[in-house]
Amino acid sequence: MRLIVVSGHSGAGKSIALRVLEDLGYYCVDNLPVNLLDAFVHSIADSKQNVAVSIDIRNIPKKLKELTGTLEQLKTELDVTVLFLDANKETLLKRYSETRRIHPLSLGGQSLSLDQAIEREKEILTPLKAHADLILNSSGQSLHELSETVRMRVEGRDRKGLVMVFESFGFKYGLPSDADYVFDVRFLPNPHWEPALRPLTGLDAPIAAFLEQHQSVLSLKYQIESFIETWLPLLEKNNRSYLTVAIGCTGGKHRSVYLTQQIGEYFADKGHQVQIRHTSLEKNAKE
C-alpha cells in the first residue's frame, strides 16, 4: 500500500491534487484529523489499496511534532509520500479574491485579515514543509496545469525509482521553491544581445549553435552532468522519490533552457526517468 499525505497552503491546490489522485485510483479522504491518521491507515492496510489523505491548517495540532512524528513512524512501515502544495502570496490573494472564500484562519475569534492569515499559515506550515518529500508550487498555474503536474509526478513515482526533474527558470521571476540543486548560468555568453537570436529560445537550433561555439558552455554542461552522475547512486540509495535540478539564467529563455534540455535528454538517454520543464517559457507563453 502506498500513502500520499497532501498538505500545504489554503488555496494552493490541495483539493485539485486530491481529485487527481482519486482519478489515479487512490482511495481519498479529505481533511482527516491528524489524531486519526495512524488508526485509519492501519485499518485499511490489508486492502492493498493506495490511499491519499489531505490535512489542512484546521486539522494540524498545535504541537506539530505530533504530526511529523506520526509521519516518520508510518514511513518505517509503509511507502509514504508527503506532498506539499505551495504558492506565493500574490497567487493566494488572487485566488481568494476570485472565489470570495474566507481563509480558515480568518474564521473564529482571531479576526485576521486575509494577508495576515496567509502569513500566519505560512509560519505554522514551515516545519511541515521541511518534512515534505515533494513540494509543488502552483503559483500562476491554471487548474489544468496543476492537475497535469500532480499527475506527472505521481505517475512517475508509481513506476518506482528516482524521478529526475530538470527545470529551467529566469532569476527575474524568482527561485523555484522545489529545487534540490540550483545552478546559476548567468555568467555564460548571452544570445539575448544578438538581435537575430533574441526572439528565439534555447530549444531552437540557432541558439544551440551559438552557445556550442563557446567552450565555457560545453564545460559547464559536462561538469553539471558529472556532478549529478557522481552523487546519483547515493541519492537513489537514500530512497528519494524525486531529484529536482533547476538551472537559471536572467530571463529563463535562452541559456538555461538550452542546458536544461540538453542535460535532461542526456540522463533520459541513459535510461533514467526524466521530466523536463521550462517554467519561464511556460509563464511567458500564457501572457
From Swiss-Prot:
InterPro entries: P-loop_NTPase, RapZ-like, RapZ-like_N, RapZ_C
Keywords: ATP-binding, GTP-binding, Nucleotide-binding
Organism, scientific name: Vibrio parahaemolyticus serotype O3:K6 (strain RIMD 2210633)
Name of the protein described by the UniProt record: Nucleotide-binding protein VP2673
Protein family: Belongs to the RapZ-like family.
Recorded superkingdom: Bacteria
Binding site for ATP: 8-15
Positions contributing to GTP binding: 56-59
GO MF annotation terms: ATP binding; GTP binding
Pfam families (UniProt xref): PapZ_C, RapZ-like_N
Purpose: Displays ATPase and GTPase activities.
